[in-house]
């Protein structure tokens, strides 16, 4: 029995030899050759209010490996999002204006709207408390 052709044959010409396809060697500090404006842009995109001052400090300390690590973490960070409406403003968005109607239907409508608000408050309370860790999860963290 002979050796299969796939083992004996040369790699296809479109595929480079493994030693050529190796990864580029990483620099000790990727920001060492960066310009001041590039570093400022990095801080500005991350939402930093003091981008110019921080960029100047980083640029002066470009040889320090701790600065490079901090900047890599900063680059991964996304800019801050707009804060959602607060609970008080969100509550106001559900308010409706009263329309003139019969007195009997108004009492029924008031009772049903109070039940709706109470059920929403209860579900919001459950959602808030759902993610709070209990004492068992705390003990689990201590044991391990």
Swiss-Prot record:
The organism of origin for this protein: Bos taurus
Superkingdom per UniProt: Eukaryota
Pfam families named in the record: TC1
Biased composition (Basic residues): 118-131
Keywords: Cell cycle
Keyword Transport in record: no
Region (Disordered): 1-20, 75-144
Name this polypeptide is given: Arginine vasopressin-induced protein 1
GO term, biological process aspect, one: positive regulation of MAPK cascade
Role noted for this protein: May be involved in MAP kinase activation, epithelial sodium channel (ENaC) down-regulation and cell cycling.
